[in-house]
Amino acid sequence: MKKIFKNLPISKNLKFLIVFGLIKKLVILLILIYPLFSSGQTNPYSDKFAHTYSIVAKDAKTGEMAVGVQSHWFSVGTLVSWGKSGVGVVATQSFVNPSYGPQGLKLMESGISAKNALKQLTEKDEGRNYRQAAMVDINGSVGAYTGESCIESAGHYIGENFSVQANMMLNDKVIPSMKKAFLENSSLPLAERIVKVFEAAESVGGDIRGKQSAALIVVGKEKTENIWQDKKIDLRVDDSEDPIKEIKRLLKVHRAYEHMNEGDLAIEENDMDKALIEYGKAQSLFPENNEMSFWKAIALLNNGKKEEAKKIFDVVFKQNPNWKKLIYRLPKSGIISMTVKELDFYFKK
């Protein structure tokens, strides 16, 4: 700056005014270009992507609520799917504003309907044009929103107790197909209905980019005091060539372990007949799992069906000898009705 004014015949006051004017213009320029780099509506790219399709729904019969999502994006369930028993579920996607999840649940828990809760959140969000979100509350109120700047094909459909929404789809057939699948599979449990919706979306093209991750959450109709009991189902596939096939498999495994848990409770209550029934159901759903076969055999043993149990033990022990080591630890815990010596005799026969 000194070189600029070195040979000019101007006063110090004039030099000051010139420098001040340049600084003023620079400040104004910075103010004008700042919005281009801020996190407001004009720059959605600072938010995480989750261009995807999803469903939020309530089962009118059981009161369960669910949110399911699939996307060609890593770990889509991390930000998109939210739920709380006795309150509601939320899906927040497109250029994701993750605060919609916890804030939406908080508003619904305070007594505000899903529709009005979503309205409040979008009204104060400067990036609303790039958002897509949906909510269902415990009373069956449904809210859905698709910003005008969401990437096509984009939109949503609100039905009784549910909403399906999508953006960046291959075509405009995805949302109608999702809606149809949900309505036509009302006889299924809610989680299985969600999987049918996933499959329907893919059958007509799905996400224009393909598939990568999926998530499925189911919460109950009653609030729970224990946070670990809040989600009845909480499944995620973070990175897979076929996330829908994988989440379908995981749901089947989950159902098997539901029966395993019931069998464990029955053993605690010394109800061996019920334990046998529950372990048997678990094994039928997941026959290749040694854990389920082993505990079914334990239940048979405790019910006096030793020969039937022995056949299962022989298969399990052949596949993994450590299970035989485990069974010898059970008498001390009172889990089986045989002593170590009796086990020795039993297995030597």
Where are these regions (language model features)?
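"A position-specific structural signal for the A-helix of alpha-solenoid helical repeats
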Residues: N261, W295, R329-L330
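Terminal, low-structured helical/coil segments at or just beyond the last alpha-helical repeat
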Residues: K318-K349
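Alpha/propeptide regions of enzymes that mature by internal proteolysis
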Residues: Q41-R209, L216, D238-E269, G280, ...
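Start-of-helix register in tetratricopeptide repeats
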Residues: Y257, E291, K325-L326
